[in-house]
């Protein structure tokens, strides 16, 4: 079955392991933010679709040649996605239009091409940040800030999912379940699973009073993030 793998920038393993790992992960991220890695071409015509696919194939070929064995493919950015979702809209980087259908499923294509090359493909999902006001406005009624108002909070001209609201982990679980149940991903990679930087005034005081249960604010927030990981891990394993 599909495994769920959470990779973090800081390893909890000793710096010098006593034994060699059975499987060495040599991974690279492929980001879609601003088209920094991919895509450069908009999928608005048959030729554009073909070129967009070719751009991804070229990246995968170069990674394979460089002896990488794992691709962390950006699957969710900030409240929008790069796969056919019933929950969130397509990212505008694909077609130039929010929610615009690129004429194919980028995640399915990435998985297929990775597997052809003997590489794993993990769904890289940004979790808590939802983007700035301009980005959120561009999503319109499709934005989670419109559909799930209770779990979204504005902070310093940006929007975030609220880790302290119990429904947040359920919403993220819906997204992960959608990906894991529909696609042959080899793992799920969580990014930005944290509170915003320098967030002493992050607006979660109501939830802290309601759910804090005697903990300090800092401990409660740490527990919230741990609970999200545990909830989704257990949920996927139970599928």
Predicted ranges, named:
Residues 15-19:
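Boundary at the C-terminal end of the N-terminal hydrophobic targeting segment
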Residues 45-61, 91-107, 174:
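N-terminal post-signal-peptidase region of extra-cytosolic proteins
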Residues 51-80, 183:
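Catalytic domains of carbohydrate-active enzymes, especially glycoside hydrolases
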Residues 2-12:
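Bacterial N-terminal signal peptides
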Residues 23, 31-54, 112, 122-182:
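Active-site-adjacent "subsite" loops/lids of carbohydrate-active enzymes
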Residues 66-102:
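Aromatic-lined carbohydrate-binding/catalytic grooves of carbohydrate-active enzymes
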Residues 68-69, 76, 104, 117, ...:
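Polysaccharide-binding and catalytic clefts of secreted carbohydrate-active enzymes
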Residues 26-30, 71-73, 121-123, 188-190:
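Hydrophobic faces of well-ordered beta-strands that scaffold small-molecule active sites
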């Amino acid at each position: 079955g599909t495994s769920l793998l959470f990779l973090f920038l800081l390893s909890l393993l000793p710096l010098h392991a006593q034994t060699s790992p059975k499987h060495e992960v040599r991974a690279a991220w492929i980001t879609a933010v601003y088209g920094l890695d991919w895509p450069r071409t908009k999928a608005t015509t048959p030729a554009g679709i073909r070129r967009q696919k070719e751009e991804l194939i070229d990246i995968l070929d170069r990674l394979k040649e460089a002896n990488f064995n794992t691709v962390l493919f950006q699957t969710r950015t900030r409240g929008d996605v790069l796969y056919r979702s019933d929950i969130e809209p397509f990212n505008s980087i694909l077609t130039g239009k929010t929610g615009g259908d690129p004429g194919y499923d980028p995640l399915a294509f990435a998985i297929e091409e990775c597997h052809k090359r003997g590489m794993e493909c993990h769904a890289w999902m940004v979790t808590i940040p939802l983007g700035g006001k301009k980005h959120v406005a561009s999503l319109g009624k499709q934005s989670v800030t419109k559909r799930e108002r209770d779990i979204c909070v504005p902070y310093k001209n940006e929007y975030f999912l609220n880790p302290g609201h119990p429904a947040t982990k359920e919403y993220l679980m819906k997204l992960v379940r959608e990906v894991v149940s529909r696609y042959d991903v080899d793992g799920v990679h969580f990014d930005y699973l944290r509170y915003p930087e320098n967030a002493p005034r992050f607006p979660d005081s109501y939830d802290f009073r309601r759910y804090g249960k005697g903990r300090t604010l800092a401990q409660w927030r740490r527990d919230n993030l741990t609970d999200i990981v545990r909830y989704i891990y257990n949920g996927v394993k139970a599928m």
